[in-house]
């Protein structure tokens, strides 16, 4: 591209040819992190060459515009401003993220906000036909802008995985993408008035269902394209990935988003081999296609510690900023800097997991991001619906952990021991036996390395929540 400035839309400058941003996502969903842990993430990002933070704060900062929503241990605004000041001193641009369609559990589960739901019995999606939804969200966005300060240039409005979007009678009477775009435009007006560019995730607007109407989305919106599988072997390709050229042809700036932690991981480790390949693919794509940036997401609902994602955080930065001769060589150089004391091949076996056994711990037991432990009989319901875990898959994973665990040290060994215990429980269930009692205090202490006390206890309750009920068929 020869031109740096490709246009003005609604008064917001659109830049395409600048050096790509390298963005680290800090996600407060599910977990309330200690201040020093967030500070450590910021310093890690700055050392690695990241120049922006995507802040997904949800209910972990005490906002005036969302009374009754923040958790008890949430940061005060002054405490959080201290972290923002630290990030600024490290050269990290703030990019706030506020969900405007789905993933609204932390708001809509509260009694004062039930009138904003798309469906009365679901609390994950806003009904954007209701004027009071846009009114509330504009107030929240305005408070975010005040909190994050004048350094904000981009603002992420979420927009992903709104699974029941446009299903109420009023919304259903509208063309979905017209409704979607109108709501985005209304909320984004607060941003445009300050010269801030809005952005959204890709999966709604670039899905097979809606991609024909992608042109209805205003061009000043940055498309945050996410695919946490592409580039890895033996995985699926998400439908919106094949639509990426269309978004570029329509003139959208695009950020590619890979991940260090996503669906399919265990609660103790990210699956290193998958995420490594995905991030290498993403970094190469951003450089080759001159995209607007690479975002390294980290979804806290998956629970594994941020410090155990550090090899992937460093690897992604290296592959974008100063790639070596090969991704494998870069990975081999990164691992020892993160306290890994085994070969890359052994490390892959040590951290391996399988999507098919994710349902046998308590995370995401009803597919809501609401940080609620499962009920007492949930394991029995899962067994009735899905059957027992695949014994061969569990056995293969167990063999890898047992073989490599003696090489691990420090927090890596601690997480490996917990991974081993969880796999042994899965193996017992596969045999039709009751799993061993979980090491509750060890798990609380493990998550307590990074989370506040109440948050660590809740995380342990979620992960360990699938205990057999009174009427279980397990022996």
Question: Which stretches of residues belong to each language-model region?
Answer:
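Sec-dependent N-terminal signal peptides
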Residues: 3-14
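Feature activates predominantly on carbohydrate-active enzymes
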Residues: 10, 18-199, 256
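Substrate-binding groove of N-acetylhexosamine-processing glycoside hydrolases
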Residues: 38-43, 82-85, 91, 131-155, ...
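Universal eukaryotic N-terminal targeting presequences
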Residues: 1-2, 46
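Polybasic, lysine/arginine-rich low-complexity segments
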Residues: 2-3, 473
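Residue-level recognition of conserved structural "scaffold" positions that shape functional pockets
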Residues: 14, 18, 109, 165-166, ...
């Amino acid at each position: 591209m020869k031109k740096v400035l490709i246009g003005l839309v609604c008064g917001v400058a659109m830049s395409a040819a600048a050096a790509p941003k390298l963005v680290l996502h800090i996600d407060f969903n599910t977990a309330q992190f200690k201040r020093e842990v967030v500070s450590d993430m910021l310093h890690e990002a700055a050392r690695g060459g990241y120049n922006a933070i995507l802040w997904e704060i949800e209910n972990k900062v005490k906002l005036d515009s969302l009374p009754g929503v923040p958790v008890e241990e949430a940061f005060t605004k002054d405490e959080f401003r201290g972290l923002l000041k630290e990030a600024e001193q490290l050269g990290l641009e703030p990019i706030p993220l506020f969900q405007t369609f789905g993933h609204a559990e932390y708001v809509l589960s509260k009694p004062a906000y039930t009138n904003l739901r798309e469906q009365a019995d679901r609390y994950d999606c806003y009904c954007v036909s209701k004027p009071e939804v846009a009114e509330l969200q504009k107030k929240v966005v305005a408070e975010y802008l005040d909190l994050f300060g004048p350094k904000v240039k981009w603002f992420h409005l979420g927009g992903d995985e709104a699974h029941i979007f446009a299903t109420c009678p009023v919304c259903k009477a509208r063309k979905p993408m017209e409704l979607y775009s109108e709501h985005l435009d209304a909320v984004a007006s607060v941003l445009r008035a300050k010269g801030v560019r809005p952005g959204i995730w890709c999966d709604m607007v670039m899905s097979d269902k809606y991609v024909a109407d992608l042109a209805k989305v205003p061009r000043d919106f940055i498309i945050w394209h996410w695919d946490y599988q592409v580039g890895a072997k033996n995985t699926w390709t998400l439908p919106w990935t094949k639509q990426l050229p269309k978004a570029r042809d329509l003139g959208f700036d695009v950020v590619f988003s890979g991940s260090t932690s996503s669906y399919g991981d265990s609660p103790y480790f990210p699956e290193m081999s998958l995420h490594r390949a995905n991030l290498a693919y993403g970094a190469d794509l951003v450089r080759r296609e001159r995209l607007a940036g690479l975002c390294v997401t980290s979804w806290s609902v998956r629970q594994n510690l941020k410090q155990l994602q550090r090899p992937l955080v460093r690897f992604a930065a290296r592959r974008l900023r100063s790639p070596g001769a090969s991704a494998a060589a870069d990975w081999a150089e990164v691992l020892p800097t993160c306290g890994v004391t085994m070969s890359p091949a052994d490390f892959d076996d040590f951290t391996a997991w399988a999507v098919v056994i994710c349902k046998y711990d308590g995370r995401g037991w009803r597919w809501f991001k609401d940080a609620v432990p499962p009920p007492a009989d949930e394991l029995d319901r899962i067994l009735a619906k899905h059957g027992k875990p695949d014994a061969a898959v569990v056995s293969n994973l167990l063999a890898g952990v047992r073989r490599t665990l003696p090489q691990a040290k420090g927090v890596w060994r601690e997480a490996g021991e917990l991974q081993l215990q969880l796999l042994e429980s899965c193996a017992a269930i596969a045999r039709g036996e009751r799993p061993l009692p979980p090491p509750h205090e060890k798990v609380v202490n493990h998550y307590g390395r990074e989370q506040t006390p109440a948050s660590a206890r809740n995380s342990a309750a979620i992960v360990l929540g699938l205990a057999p009920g009174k009427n279980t068929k397990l022996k």
